[in-house]
Amino acid sequence: MSKYSPLIAAKAVWQMRIRKRPFVLSHAINSRCNMRCSFCEYWKNEGVEMELDDIFRLLDQARDFGILVYNAWTVEPLLRKELPQILRHAKQLGMVTSLITNGLLLEKRADELVDLDYLSVSVDGTASYQDIRGVSLERIMPGIIKAKNIINNPLLMNCVISGKNLDDIEELITMAQDMDVKISFEPMYEFQGIASDTWNDMGIRDMEKYRRTVDRIIEMKKEGYPIINSCTYLKMVRELKPAFNCHANEIILDVNADGSIENCRVHRSPIGHISEGIAKVWERTRKTRKDTARECSKCLFFGYVENSLMYNFNLEVAQHYEWM
């Protein structure tokens, strides 16, 4: 975390290692987006969204189950008008709150985020940003500047590394330092269902240049730039080889906008529904989740990798990974 808390760390160990329960509720808070990024599949599937009272009940269940972190994300949380009430309810239950956004509505809604602890904004480049996201970087910068002065912890900019933005990475890191915000990196994940033309356009083709870029990220981290990733993780990113035991589906309870529960961002087939009760779904699917993790070829989503390494008490990650 950006601010290490021995108490929260102890609660996390108790919840995950002793009780064998998740520590984080990752909630797809809506099914709509105000961007149309070619490499993303989420915005293409608008569907049913839980009513506010159902979300409150979900949060109540989660807290009763021992979950201490609420993460609101996907498709674009700031499109959900009741977001402030949802965050407030989570905070009143004693949960740490976090939010992932594309930032387009951040300037407009930043004042409403008084109950938010951690904010992550997707910033995938400087010169390449418009080509990647379809809007100009200038559209989101005022919101980032405004929000960083409202939330309690350092704001995070997350960059997905692709073939489009390799020339922007060092500038982006320097920009993060100048703005007094944190920055994280992860490689692009090739979701099924996205056109091959998109991957041909966005994918990493020049591996030598890619590795030089990641080497520079590692160097700049060691030089003290505000990069939250661990070196252990960044070395995996450099080789695009996930060398870890995944515990994402033990750490995180993943709930969709319609209330269905899925294994993780990669294995998205529903394994239950909150109407069953999350405790029942968790216990019933224990073997299924274990089998899925064992058979998975693994991804490099930084939240999954870093937290799985933390779960296994990796010392370097514990020392140098700085986020939820």
Predicted regions, residues:
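Conserved alpha-helical substructure of the radical SAM core
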Residues: M1-E112, Y118, N312, H320-M324
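Processing junctions and N-termini across compartments
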Residues: H27, S31-N34, L240, K290-A293
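Flexible mid-to-C-terminal extensions adjoining Fe-S/redox cofactors in radical SAM and related proteins
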Residues: I8-M16, R21, A243, D258-M324
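Short loop/turn motifs at secondary-structure junctions
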Residues: R36, G66-I67, D115, I151, ...
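Secreted/processed peptides and extracellular or luminal domains of membrane proteins
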Residues: F39, W43-E46, I252, P270, ...
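Radical SAM enzyme [4Fe-4S]-AdoMet core and its adjacent flexible, acidic
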Residues: A28, M50, L93-V96, D111, ...
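Conserved residues at the C-terminal ends of beta-strands
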Residues: W43, W73, S122, E186, ...
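Cys/His/Pro-rich metal-binding microdomains
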Residues: N34, S38-E41, H247, S297-L300
